[in-house]
UniProtKB/Swiss-Prot annotation:
Residue span(s) of domain Rieske: 43-141
Pathway where this protein functions: Aromatic compound metabolism; 3-phenylpropanoate degradation
Cofactor requirements of the protein: Fe cation; [2Fe-2S] cluster
Source taxon at top rank: Bacteria
Database matches in SUPFAM superfamilies: Bet v1-like (SSF55961), ISP domain (SSF50022)
Official protein name in the record: 3-phenylpropionate/cinnamic acid dioxygenase subunit alpha
HAMAP family: HcaE
Role: Part of the multicomponent 3-phenylpropionate dioxygenase. Converts 3-phenylpropionic acid (PP) and cinnamic acid (CI) into 3-phenylpropionate-dihydrodiol (PP-dihydrodiol) and cinnamic acid-dihydrodiol (CI-dihydrodiol), respectively.
Reaction catalyzed: 3-phenylpropanoate + NADH + O2 + H(+) = 3-(cis-5,6-dihydroxycyclohexa-1,3-dien-1-yl)propanoate + NAD(+); (E)-cinnamate + NADH + O2 + H(+) = (2E)-3-(cis-5,6-dihydroxycyclohexa-1,3-dien-1-yl)prop-2-enoate + NAD(+)
Residues involved in Fe cation binding: H213, H218
Organismal lineage: Bacteria, Pseudomonadati, Pseudomonadota, Gammaproteobacteria, Enterobacterales
Residues annotated as signal peptide: none
Gene this protein is translated from: hcaE
NCBIfam families associated with the record: 3PPDioc_HcaE
Length: 453
């Protein structure tokens, strides 16, 4: 398609009516605009602070399709740089992570300090007899880097709102993972990486707001693992949770704001996640009192939930998997998944967390495979001309949004709804059609007000 004006984008997504045209998942022109206006100016997750604890530690990642290296400085601060030599655009760092005193380009040998300064140019005197202003040719620095309770984010846009303002009420939900115990969290093990042939918005939307698929897409896993109270055989250990949470929950909530979203069940027991090892379920019971003191009852009990910070940072409560959906064109995403656990947990519990996350949501995880097949098959369908120009229904519980009076913040709906999907694509369209953050925020404010008027 050819984008000539903003109305061409809003024609593809009508959040107020619950309509979406699947061209948004496949069009290469839209994808290039996303790289510029979403990945070029939204806050993007870079690394967990535990992955770069010491001066000189670095972690290689992406902001959209731009390779970025995140580095711990000598003074303890964190900087991030475009992984691009200023001479001929070669990467200066190929290692996934490590510790270094300098980054040296393998093409012509230009070297940069961990602070990004150009510190050495081979044969400088004879190659540049007129002189070379090295101060001018340091690595391009990501201008905005902030840390939220251990999660390091970056943003190319200096006019963007602060990270805490960008997160909004989503920070309240995020704290349920990051702030359960004194000492915060850390990454356990390495990063698992794999490719899925689908558009990045499909998994981001599902993690943000789709509990609806679980009973159907994951039916076999539910049947095998969701043991009932009194059952003797528990596939994941003697202390495994003894019922599917959706059978016993007293309520269920979906939250949406500014493209972010999550969904969860309100439970009465601190082990309500059927996908984790018995050792993990037991750990949640044993540490519940501390979590409730720090977070309150709702978040301390919130152990079966799905979440996404727009655009591409997702996690699952209880299961301890956190992942980033790195876009690789309009029809492919590179998944980076890692296990995040309480730093205060014992080594045995951390190992159980890692086992649970890998078994369910690693590249060969029994739930991950269900999800990936859905996304890949959707992308295949959208190769067709008629299919990608059709209209899809996004009306679930349209008009049922509300603001709760029980302390759960933000615009909410029942967990089986598409409030999050509508809000995510409204934010997507607002970002693509707005020149400034003032415009983006005003459009979001108007949309949020309409939901609960």
């Amino acid at each position: 398609m050819t984008l000539s004006k903003d109305s061409d984008i809003y024609r593809l997504i009508d959040a107020r009516a619950g309509r979406v045209t699947p061209q948004i998942y496949i069009d290469p022109e839209l994808y290039q605009l996303e790289l510029e206006r979403i990945f070029g100016r939204c806050w993007l997750f870079l690394a967990h602070q535990s992955q770069i604890p010491n001066p000189g530690d670095f972690f290689n990642t992406y902001m959209g399709e731009d390779s970025v290296v995140v580095v711990r400085q000598k003074n303890g601060s964190v900087k991030a740089f475009l992984n691009q030599c200023r001479h001929r655009s070669m990467r200066v760092c190929y290692a996934d992570s490590g510790n270094t005193r300098a980054f040296t380009c393998p093409y012509h040998g230009w070297s940069y300090g961990v602070d990004g300064r150009l510190i050495d140019v081979p044969l400088e005197a004879c190659a540049y007899p007129h002189g070379l202003c090295k101060e001018q040719w340091g690595l391009q620095e990501v201008p905005c880097v902030e840390n939220y309770k251990g999660l390091i984010f970056g943003n190319w846009d200096t006019t963007a709102p602060s990270l805490i303002d960008y997160l909004g009420d989503m920070a309240w939900y995020l704290d349920g993972v990051l702030d359960r115990r004194e000492g915060g969290t850390e990454v356990i093990g390495g990063v698992q990486k794999w490719l899925i042939n689908c558009n990045w918005k499909l998994p981001a939307e599902q993690f943000a707001g789709d509990q609806y698929h679980a009973l159907f897409s994951h039916a076999s896993a539910v049947q095998v693992l969701s043991v009932k109270d009194g059952d003797d055989k528990k596939a994941l250990g003697a202390d495994q949770t003894s019922r599917p949470v959706w059978e016993t929950a007293k309520d269920a909530v979906q939250f949406a704001q500014n493209g972010h979203g999550c969904g969860f069940f309100l439970t009465e027991k601190p082990d309500a996640n059927v996908w984790v090892d018995g050792a993990v379920a037991r750990y949640y019971r044993e540490t519940y009192a501390e979590a409730e003191q720090r977070l309150g009852k709702v978040r301390a009990l919130r152990l079966a939930g799905h979440n996404n910070i727009f655009p591409t940072l997702s996690w699952l409560n209880g299961t301890a998997t956190m992942r980033v959906w790195h876009p690789r064109g309009p029809d492919q995403v590179e998944v980076w998944a890692f296990c995040i656990a309480d730093k205060a947990a014992s080594p045995e519990v951390k190992a159980a967390f890692e086992n649970s996350a890998t078994r369910a949501f690693g590249p060969a995880g029994f739930l991950e495979q269900d999800d990936s097949e859905n996304w890949v098959e959707i992308q295949k369908v959208l190769r067709g001309y008629k299919a990608r120009n059709s209209t899809l229904c996004m009306e679930m519980r349209l008009g049922q949004e509300r603001v709760r009076d029980d302390g759960i913040p933000g615009v909410t709906n029942y967990v089986f709804s598409e409030t999050v999907a509508r809000g995510m694509y409204q934010r997507w369209a607002d970002l693509l059609t707005s020149e400034t953050w003032d415009e983006i925020e005003e459009k979001s404010r108007v949309y949020q007000q309409e939901l609960v008027k």
